[in-house]
From Swiss-Prot:
Entry's cofactor comment: Binds 1 zinc ion per subunit.
InterPro entries from the UniProt entry: Cys-tRNA-ligase (IPR015803), Cys-tRNA-synt_Ia_DALR (IPR015273), Cys-tRNA/MSH_ligase (IPR024909), CysS_C (IPR056411), Rossmann-like_a/b/a_fold (IPR014729), tRNA-synt_1_cat_dom (IPR032678), tRNAsynth_Ia_anticodon-bd (IPR009080)
Protein name: Cysteine--tRNA ligase
UniProt-listed Pfam families: CysS_C, DALR_2, tRNA-synt_1e
Similarity comment: Belongs to the class-I aminoacyl-tRNA synthetase family.
Length: 464
């Protein structure tokens, strides 16, 4: 049985789907004004693994992850680049897709864009107005938090205790400081950048919170199983989604389970432009770090715990994956005829405990190394690979992994072993290592002075 920590009830619960034959999940996706940073990527990777697990356990899963392609940040980026919102959002949506593909994230079932759902947004706002949960004020439309008695059910915040002006937008047109905008009138910049649409309240654009309520309803209906996102979205975004959606549909439970991944810091500091410490996925990839290493680094800490990003996180992840890939050096793996480790799946079922699942991979690796029977070794290795690939790692072959130019250490480690073998006159082992290097795409040449030169996809390097 799958168990998930439900932020709504503040406890880990057995996952009981609304319809066991069709699981529905909505996750807040990116605001496409810049390339994705590792905080964005952590959320995408976490829910990618949850998506895989739910499909494995239940079969049919509809996974909706939105794109916010109209927002103040996008408008500011368009202004700064002397561009327009369509060009900015299209470009950064494309880079987002490329970066997420590089870290082995599957596409969601649907990926709706806010700008393609303006009609749905307007209809939902009209429903809230008709039900008395929203009001017009100076060409704005606001949601009235006082009209929804359960406001604060997710975050535990009470209306009269909110810190207005921090995460809550303050406005002169509101009846209550906690009221949030559903529709805002177009300003000069909106007209300049074409970031406005016609509505019953005049030309304007939607507020952020109403977009997700409208898109989740359009693609999943008024009730669905799981709503996911980063813990930073719990308030006010997710709190406001609940208020909107349950006010629009009186009998609705909206999302049954609320799942939140933890914060990500860099060297124990919050990522911010002012600290110049924003780590972009694309920059990591361009520096030669493999997408699989980035993915593993984002998964090795439990999804609900804070993750501190340091140089050690990357180096340790690279080292672990190198260790895992070495198990494949003499084996051509076709894992279609084997099953994922049951213990591995049970770990994932326990509130997506990926660190526990990874610990099981390490145990399997130890067992593979200890096994002398070749048939048993092959059988164990197949199960090991099948399990690892379940969370999106070990997707390459041994040769591909170590011939990519990142793994100097592995090449030099093998050359060291070959040198020792030759010194011990163990020429069979030396020849096997030469062949192993050849399979990795590395050619070696022994020099008269005792050094070895190796050639791969990179420039030749003299190893001493």
């Amino acid at each position: 049985m799958v168990k998930l920590y439900n932020t709504l009830t503040k406890k880990k619960e057995p996952f009981t789907p609304i319809d066991k034959d069709h699981i529905k999940m909505y996750v807040c996706g990116p605001t496409v004004y810049d390339t994705a940073h590792i905080g964005n990527a952590r959320s995408i990777v976490v829910y990618d693994v949850l998506f895989r697990l739910l499909k494995f356990c239940y079969g049919k899963v509809t996974y909706v992850r939105n794109i916010t392609d109209i927002d103040d940040k996008i408008i500011n980026a368009a202004n700064e680049k002397n561009s327009n919102i369509e060009s900015i959002s299209k470009y950064y949506t494309k880079t987002f897709h490329e970066d997420m593909e590089s870290i082995n994230c599957a596409e969601p079932t649907y990926e709706p864009k806010a700008t393609e759902n303006i009609d749905n947004i307007i209809k939902l706002i009209e429903s809230l107005l008709q039900a008395g949960h929203a009001y017009e004020s100076n060409k704005h439309v606001y949601f009235s938090v006082e009209s929804y008695p359960e406001y604060g059910v997710l975050s535990g915040k009470k209306i009269d205790e909110l810190n207005y002006g921090s995460r809550v937008e303050v406005g002169e047109n509101k009846k209550h400081p906690g009221d949030f905008v559903l529709w805002k009138p177009a300003n000069e910049t909106d007209y300049k950048l074409s970031s406005h649409w016609n509505s019953p309240w005049g030309e304007g654009r939607p507020g952020w919170h109403i977009e997700c309520s409208a898109m989740s309803y359009a693609y999943l209906g008024k009730d669905f199983d799981i709503h996911g996102g980063g813990i930073d979205l719990q308030f006010p975004h997710h709190e406001n989604e609940i208020a909107q959606s349950k006010s629009a549909f009186a009998e609705s439970t909206f999302a049954k389970y609320w799942v939140h991944n933890g914060f990500l810091t860099v060297n124990e500091e919050k990522m911010s432009k002012s600290l110049f410490n924003i780590v972009k996925v694309r920059d990591l990839l361009d520096s030669g770090i493999k997408g699989e290493v980035i993915r593993y680094a984002l998964l090795k800490t439990h999804y609900r715990k804070p993750l501190d990003w340091t140089e050690n996180v990357i180096s340790e992840s690279q080292e672990t994956l190198n260790k895992f890939y070495r198990l494949l050096r003499s084996t051509c793996i076709e894992e279609s005829d084997t099953e994922v480790s049951k213990d591995f799946i049970e770990a994932l079922k326990n509130d997506l405990n990926i660190p526990e699942a990874v610990a099981i991979l390490h145990e399997m690796a130890t067992e593979i190394n200890k096994t002398s029977n070749e048939y048993e070794k092959l059988k164990l290795t197949k199960k090991f690979v099948k399990s690892a690939r379940f969370i999106g790692i070990l997707e390459s072959s041994y040769q591909e992994w170590f011939a990519s130019g990142v793994s100097h250490q592995e090449i030099e480690r093998l050359i060291d072993l070959r040198k020792v073998a030759k010194q011990n006159k163990d020429y069979d082992t030396a020849d096997k290592i030469r062949e192993q290097l050849k399979q990795m795409g590395v050619t070696i040449s022994d020099n008269e002075d005792g050094t070895t030169t190796w050639y791969g996809k990179l420039s030749p390097i003299v190893y001493r």
